[in-house]
Amino acid sequence: MTIRKMVALLLASVMALTVGVACAEMTPGTYEGVAQGFGGPVTVKVTVDAAAVTAAEITGEGETPALGGAAIEQLTTALVGVSDAAAVDAVAGATVTSTAVKEALAAALAQAAGEAPAADAALAFTAGTYTATAKGYNGPVEVSVTFTDSAIASIEVTAHKETAHVGDVAFAPMIADMLAANGTGVDGVSGATFSGAALRNAVNDAAEQAGCTNPTAFKTNTVAHEPQAAVEDTWDVVIVGAGGAGMVAAAQAAQDGNTVLVIEKNAEMGGNTLVSGGAFQSVMPYLVWDAADPDATTGVNPLDGQTYDKVKSDIGRIETLKTILGWSEEPFDGTIDAEHPFVAGDIGLNAVRGVHAEYLPVLKALKAEIQAYLDWAQPQLDAGVNETQLTVFSTMNLHIFQTYYGGLRPNADHTAWIYSDVDLVKQFVEGGQDIKPWLVAQGAKFDYARQFTLIGCLWQRENSPVGGVVDGVEYASKWGAYFMVPYNTMTKANAHNQLMLRTTATELIVTDGRVTGVKAVGYDGTEVTAHATKGVILATGGYAANIDMVQSTNEYWDASFIADNIGTTNRSSLMGDGITMAAAVGAATEGEGWTQMMPLGWVDNGNLAGGAGENVIYVNAATGKRYVDESAERDVLSEGAFENGMSKETAEKLGLKYVPGIYVEVSNTGVTAGPGGFNNLPEDVPGRMVFRTVEETAELIGCDAATLRKTIEDYDAYVMGVSDTLEVPKLSIQATVGDVEKDENGNYLPETYKLENLRVRFMAPSTHHTMGGVKVDVERHVLDADGNAIPGLYAAGEITSGNHAGNRLGGNAVTEIIVSGRAAAQAVNADNE
């Protein structure tokens, strides 16, 4: 749910405050000030007598409901009786909104005291060019602004680190509007809130340097975007959402000969996929153990005909396979009591519970595959060969079964369990085999040599996009492979095919019980009516950015973990719009009580930090000890962080914004966050990452240095094989924290071990993925409460339920969105043949 406008009003009779410092005597009346908030201008209108505020009204249209909205209500109360803005305390967790309120109040009080120009006073500047910076999503945004004596002449963003095609798309339209408005009170751009706010703040700073004579007017000056003539047209397929699932569906629909319209609320295609790691889970048979040629050390990739070295196993894979081999084949028993405890991520406990009937055939087939592998591997292990020298075991059945037990979870009060729909899981696991061939045929490029891990993925099964080539031009990474390539396929298939940006779908059109189109509105208010002769595909993503919705639907997490100020890895546009539209036409929903937390969230903004758990350790800042299996599922890691998070005092000492669950990641200095645009430079990043000695790290986080050193050395001893126990067990390990050499067979040489410098990161869980959503079948028809398909309506990607149950494996999302996007488009075509 989106609250467009929050207004709080309180009269003087409600309360009065005593403050320490007063302004000069004020002229009684009503005054207004404006300052930049998180999502747009915040306006404070106050009525004053000669000494203080007697009534206050605060308006902040763009502020986040759960944070800025709550702060506005609280601060409105606090303003009555105030005569000095400095006396108003900020609201915890809403610093940006609080600061805006105080600045706007100061401007209003200055007018009342005769110390500021009237709101309608003319603008004047000291002509010249000024440089200013403001904090963006990923770092400082620097601008160069040139003023005449009365207006902005030019604005140039001279440096920034905002995400390409996500944050940086705010700059051009907002700069154009600022120049036309001669001020910064212009509309932001959906999906780029942080970046737009940084641009506004930087331009405001430049105006202040230029001696702006009327800051209030400058910050409120805007342009009115008048609606254009209403748009009404017809396509075969209308798709809502231009993220990964939507653009894949568009390309498939176009390949099938359909005309296609894609409606996207943001200023560019990409959706949440563009801010994800981008890797997808799918076993590449030529890179893993082959029962038909068990001793092979290389394999041939059928896509390029080249030979590649097979991937070696991580430490601990054999033990996991043996646990699965011993998995009970009895019907699943969900009893949870003292004798049958539930511990998220403990597959040993789940193995004795049995298996749901739908997954029994998968388990039996997998056991046969595992037994064949162990018959080959065990003699080598018995002969002293290190596990890391063996080719890794990996099959589609393993992927299916790990998706099953990785998402098998009870609700918070242990009265019900949730698990994935086996048909949907089989669909995306098996369909994952065709992702590379299909996209490569259109121009995409992938890393063919690796099957790596990322956080919470459970196995070495990840694949990374390299980019894509369109008309001889190469586009990097996710943008190239997942967006420019399918966009090119769509647009070249038919001149009528279109991507409509900055346009928000508002409702589905239903004719005689069938969904026949979409109503939408452009950023300027232009009305759009898009008719679909064959079907509508919803690919709007989830709602992890809608903290209110996450909190209200929660059935899994301790409520205290989902604080109002929790971060999110999602773009601000991921609010659950598509689910709401689908429900309005009778769609059933399920599984919304399970929201995935991403343990690798930066503390300052919730953004995805990237990385894996097999090559790092997580440390409690107070004790200096490990507290969790870092290679476990994401909910396990997040719960561990919440339960072992640092104190507010420690966070503030480190200069970190306090949120629940801040923890310390420690690794070798050579570890990187992986592909996908993450910061992999070996340098300090304030508030995020530092490089320090063990002793310096201990002093920094406030733990005992000897304890921290022992924690790391004990862990490394286990990794090197010097010790056979860990205080906190770990299923899969790739590397030591300290430096150590290996012999030609890959065995560690403990005598070369040394522990000196560390790579240290500060992170906390962020909302990341909503596993629940609209109910669908394998053809991606949207189903009603009775299980019947709603004619003409399909859905793909995170908007749907049934794929991941209570916890999603890392990398499964991208696999699922690509496979389901294609499946939905193919179903539309098949249903209309």
Model-derived features: positions:
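Active-site- and interface-proximal helix/loop "cap" or "latch" segments in soluble metabolic
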Residues: E25-N221
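Beta1/beta-strand and adjacent pyrophosphate-binding region of the FAD-binding site
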Residues: P227-A245, L261
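Glycine-rich FAD pyrophosphate-binding loop
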Residues: Q255-V275
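N-terminal glycine-rich dinucleotide-binding loop that anchors FAD/FMN and/or NAD(P) in oxidoreductases
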Residues: V275-T320
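Conserved redox-cofactor binding core of oxidoreductases
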Residues: P331-T526, I547-D548, I712, V719-L755
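An anion/pyrophosphate-binding glycine-rich loop and adjacent beta-alpha core
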Residues: P379, I579, A588-T707
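A glycine-rich dinucleotide-binding beta-alpha-beta segment and adjacent secondary-structure elements
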Residues: E507, T707-N803, N807
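Glycine-rich loop(s) and the adjacent beta-strand/alpha-helix scaffold that form part
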Residues: Y523-G601, R780, S820-A823
